[in-house]
Amino acid sequence: RLDGAGLCGGHRDGTILCLGNTLVTAQSVRGLLREHGWEWGIAVIGRLKPFDQFTRLRDIALTHAEPLRCVTLEEGMLSGGFGSLIAEQFAGHALPLDLLRCGVDAFVPAGSKEECAVWAGLAPHQIVQQILQRWPWLAQGDSPKGTDIGQYASPLGDV
């Protein structure tokens, strides 16, 4: 459940940053990660222009001894998109950030929202796989349950 600032849950292991249109996906990803004992928070960003929510992100970042691990979920192009804005904001304020941008970097053929998400690698199981590839220590047992990264392989094979 989101609090008044658009935050959901603890963020010991990382924070998923999303816009309203990707909140359901973020919640699914968080649920899959939670099954393995990882605590990822969700921060919903209300708008990009004007971007007035950096103070909230800075406060999250300052609670971490290490660089803040963030995943951005974006349905638009990666270059110049939501993740780029987040990276620029952190760099501009000299705050450490370890960022994984999950988004589209190619033309997506027509299909249902679910088909397009799978094609673009934005289905929840695919995002979890990207997280585990980016931060392999998560898959190497640094959790109460451990995991097998293969269980998050796409049901359609490599997409």
Descriptions of predicted regions:
Residues 1-159:
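Thiamine diphosphate
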